[in-house]
């Protein structure tokens, strides 16, 4: 894998390299994982068996007599073995957990379980090995059979044993297939560009801001293993291209209110951002007061920013219709937050996502925090 080479050439292990390089490695891994998964097809056991059956029907004996029969039955066995091996070997191209970027790895760890995933791959590997053993064994039995009946009997037995290996893999194949399908969906954030994750209570203006700043209509993709979505806008600003990501329902409430799925989703999400943008809603229509919003901010600082060494940029949104009292309180709370988490917090910037007030200055600050393209 290319990224391992980079780390090795730098003479260091991945977690010891500089943060920017680590980010770069993660981004490249992320892309590699998705590119790889796109090219893999994970069949069900039933599909493999059915495919074998179709191909099997087309085989015809070429010679008469016992020698011809042996040759024919070996051909049939070989066909079954070859198909099973090829299909399963393709499945084994699924990346090992240790070769994955953190986002994808954590998704699997949280929603599937690391052991369950590795076990599935192990079973597939084992099935290939056993299939090979049956092929070796039964090929000899058929080749040395003393009658047409005996040749048939061994072929039946050999094919049966190989196909029963496949049938017993069914559960594991289904799991790998699901993992593949879920992770491939993350292609919209897997191009290797820097990521800014936007947080804030519902109606704070996250969607409005992302729509305003993205070059095209934001893309919506399923958040793997959940019924939630990831919304991604691509932002181009002064030579910098990055993603602005919204994850509705995940960074909108303090974490003690999260259900199990949201907690898992958050754990995976933690490794994604290069910076976090937190939006305060200071309008009279805000659905939560600013104390609540500050608690959410603090949660995000502790659970994402501090753990991953990324900054949180604070923007006070809806400045065009700000409620005076809420605005003043917000300044006070932010002051306190800055005292507590001085090195992590940037801002605040007053903006109106709707009217476009202050957004250029905000972008200027945001891009300073992102790894540069080159
Ligand atoms: N006046 C005003 N309204 C805004 C502003 N930003 C967003 N809104 C409105 O607030 C509502 C919720 O915005 P939305 O972007 O959907 O919030 P989200 O839930 O955080 O994605 C919408 O009606 C927006 O038009 C702003 O800067 N000023
Ligand atoms: Mg929204």
Language-model segments: what does each one mean?
Residues 189-191, 213-243, 251-267:
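Switch I (effector-binding) loop of TRAFAC-class P-loop GTPase G-domains
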Residues 1-127:
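N-terminal accessory targeting/assembly segments
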Residues 271-294, 319-326:
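Conserved Switch II/interswitch segment of TRAFAC-class P-loop GTPases
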Residues 320-374:
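Canonical P-loop GTPase G-domain recognition
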Residues 243, 273-280, 304-320, 343-350:
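Conserved beta-strand/loop subsegment of P-loop NTPase cores
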Residues 259-284, 298-307:
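Inter-motif core of Ras-like GTPase G domains
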């Amino acid at each position: 894998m290319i990224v391992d080479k980079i780390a090795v050439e730098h003479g260091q292990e991945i977690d010891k390299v500089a943060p920017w390089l680590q980010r770069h490695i993660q981004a490249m891994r992320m892309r590699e994982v998705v590119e790889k998964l796109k090219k893999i097809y994970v069949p069900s056991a039933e599909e493999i068996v059915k495919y074998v059956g179709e191909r099997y029907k087309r085989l015809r004996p070429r010679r008469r007599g016992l020698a011809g029969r042996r040759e024919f039955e070996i051909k049939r066995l070989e066909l079954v073995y070859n198909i099973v091996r090829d299909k399963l070997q393709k499945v084994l191209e699924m990346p090992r957990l240790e070769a994955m970027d953190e986002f994808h790895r954590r998704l699997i760890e949280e929603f599937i379980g690391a052991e369950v995933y590795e076990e599935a791959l192990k079973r597939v590997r084992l099935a290939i090995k056993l299939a090979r053993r049956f092929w070796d064994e039964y090929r000899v039995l058929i080749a040395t059979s003393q009658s047409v009946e005996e040749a048939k009997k061994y072929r039946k037995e050999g094919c049966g044993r190989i196909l029963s290996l496949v049938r017993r893999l069914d559960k594991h194949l289904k799991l790998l297939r699901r993992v593949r399908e879920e992770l491939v969906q993350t292609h919209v954030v897997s191009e290797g560009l820097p990521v800014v994750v936007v947080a804030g209570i519902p109606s704070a203006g996250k969607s409005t801001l992302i729509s305003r700043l993205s070059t095209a209509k934001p893309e919506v993709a399923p958040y793997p293993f959940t019924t939630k979505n990831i919304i991604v806008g691509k932002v181009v600003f002064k030579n910098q291209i990055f993603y602005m990501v919204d994850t509705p329902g995940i960074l909108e409430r303090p974490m003690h209110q999260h259900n199990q799925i949201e907690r898992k989703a958050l754990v995976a999400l933690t490794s994604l951002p290069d910076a976090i943008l937190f939006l305060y809603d200071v309008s009279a229509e805000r659905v939560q007061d600013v104390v609540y919003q500050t608690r959410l901010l603090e949660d995000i600082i502790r659970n994402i920013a501090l753990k991953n060494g990324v900054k949180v940029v604070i923007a006070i949104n809806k400045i065009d219709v700000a409620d005076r009292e809420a605005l003043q309180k917000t300044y006070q709370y932010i002051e306190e937050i800055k005292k507590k988490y001085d090195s992590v917090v940037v801002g605040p910037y007053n903006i109106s996502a709707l009217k476009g007030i202050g957004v250029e200055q905000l972008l200027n600050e945001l891009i300073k925090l992102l790894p540069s393209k080159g």
